[in-house]
């Protein structure tokens, strides 16, 4: 099975990427490679992958824009689409991890019926409108939460494959101390809620992730930094592993409707229970009383932390390995690729 992957350009596709989608894709390609797939990746040239890498840009767009070497992402994305069109005939499946931007590939004669679009981000009304115009796209979402919306909009070929991680790359820790928050520092991710919970409970908190909303950071995070509450910036895989494994509980007070919530299973892989708002796909991921707890409202979160500390960390690790290890996820994708192949015979 020969697969052409279209990866995001914002960050390198790498296990140490700052973006969750890029981290996930790097792991998926490794797992598919073990199943015998021959993978080619269209992504930034600083990506790290066992796939044949076709550089769309020499470095990721965030780095290029920071250095004032790029300004408008659309031109680089158009170049990626052009490269995909030039190479598409060589592959059994063209797997796009982009949205929006390349749905037009599905309209190209001879290759369109072999294009799979994976929807990683939340489904908004504009995408629902688009699906009503194009209901026969091959789609997969990373949660039933997303799929329900697309099917309601008329999607006829919409499948669910949950996100996954290489569980073995995370170190199981039989115990932890304090709280951890990992995510973008912006209102939708709720880092300010995590700070408030830590202060209310008198527990130490370590926050990590890129600062997107500098005003929020300056007003609601920075004034509380000190011995109890620390901010350590953007973390790589090893640092993430250490952060999540050392915590007694991971706080994920996401205000927005998460398409999946990858950090939740990364924490669980370390044995760390999760306390989160029951938004988006998180009710599909967190098993209350087993791997963590979910709250309907922000004000209910703090009361769930102490019960979460009593959960069996070894069982948490076992559950995430059984449900979300990349070996399991890659198997689901391979079956979907084969289904696309059968439909095109």
Describe the residue ranges of each PLM region.
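Catalytic cores of nucleotide-sugar-dependent glycosyltransferases that transfer UDP/GDP/TDP-activated
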Residues: 1-345
